[in-house]
């Protein structure tokens, strides 16, 4: 049976409610912290390293929650939200691959911001290239990620790490 290779906003909400991968397993945050509207493509192979890739998108609207508070009179998307979206996507990938446990961001190598998302932007595109996927007792993904606004790359993160944990009380 072939895995589903794209996901609508409604399906992402189902994942956020814990309905997609089963109770206690990988789960996306719900809005407003869910930082993408759809997964355009997700593959086990391909991408820069041949170990899988995710492409997701967020439609930029002037009424997005963060523009009203970051900053008054100078609205800009916080860079940490774009970075969090990248971690969210790596965690989703691990659940999609059948990994068990709750997702936790474990770190990143270099993170670079070379641009900004303003309310006048139209489309954010995230591209996550899996470097390594470990599916043993330890479930972990290591990926490089790129974020574009309207086709222009503005964020790059290397060696993003996300793990799935069956116990988080001692984390």
Curated annotation (Swiss-Prot):
GO terms for cellular component: cytoplasm. InterPro entries: FabA, FabA_FabZ, HotDog_dom_sf. The keyword Lyase applies. CDD domains: FabA. Keywords: Cytoplasm, Fatty acid biosynthesis, Fatty acid metabolism, Isomerase, Lipid biosynthesis, Lipid metabolism, Lyase. Its main location: cytoplasm. Pathway: Lipid metabolism; fatty acid biosynthesis. It is found in: Cytoplasm. Its EC number is 4.2.1.59, 5.3.3.14. The keyword Iron does not apply. One of its GO terms (biological process) is unsaturated fatty acid biosynthetic process. One of its GO terms (molecular function) is trans-2-decenoyl-acyl-carrier-protein isomerase activity. The active site is at residue 70. It catalyses: a (3R)-hydroxyacyl-[ACP] = a (2E)-enoyl-[ACP] + H2O; (3R)-hydroxydecanoyl-[ACP] = (2E)-decenoyl-[ACP] + H2O; (2E)-decenoyl-[ACP] = (3Z)-decenoyl-[ACP]. Homodimer. Necessary for the introduction of cis unsaturation into fatty acids. Catalyzes the dehydration of (3R)-3-hydroxydecanoyl-ACP to E-(2)-decenoyl-ACP and then its isomerization to Z-(3)-decenoyl-ACP. Can catalyze the dehydratase reaction for beta-hydroxyacyl-ACPs with saturated chain lengths up to 16:0, being most active on intermediate chain length. NCBIfam families: fabA, PRK05174.1. Belongs to the thioester dehydratase family. FabA subfamily. This is 3-hydroxydecanoyl-[acyl-carrier-protein] dehydratase. The lineage of its organism: Bacteria, Pseudomonadati, Pseudomonadota, Betaproteobacteria, Nitrosomonadales.
């Amino acid at each position: 049976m072939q895995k589903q290779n794209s996901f609508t906003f409604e399906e992402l909400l189902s994942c956020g409610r814990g309905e997609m991968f089963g109770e206690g397993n990988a789960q996306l945050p719900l809005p407003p912290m869910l930082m993408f509207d759809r997964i355009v493509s997700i593959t086990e192979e391909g991408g820069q390293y041949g170990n899988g890739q995710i492409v997701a998108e967020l439609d930029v609207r002037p009424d997005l929650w963060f523009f009203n508070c970051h900053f008054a009179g100078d609205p800009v998307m916080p860079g940490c939200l774009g970075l969090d979206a990248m971690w969210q996507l790596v965690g989703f990938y691990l659940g999609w691959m059948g990994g068990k446990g709750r997702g936790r961001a474990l770190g990143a190598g270099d993170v670079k911001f070379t641009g900004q998302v303003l309310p006048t932007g139209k489309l954010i595109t995230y591209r996550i290239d899996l470097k390594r996927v470990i599916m043993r007792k330890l479930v972990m993904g290591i990926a490089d990620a790129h974020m574009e606004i309207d086709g222009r790359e503005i964020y790059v993160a290397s060696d993003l790490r996300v793990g799935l944990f069956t116990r988080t009380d001692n984390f």
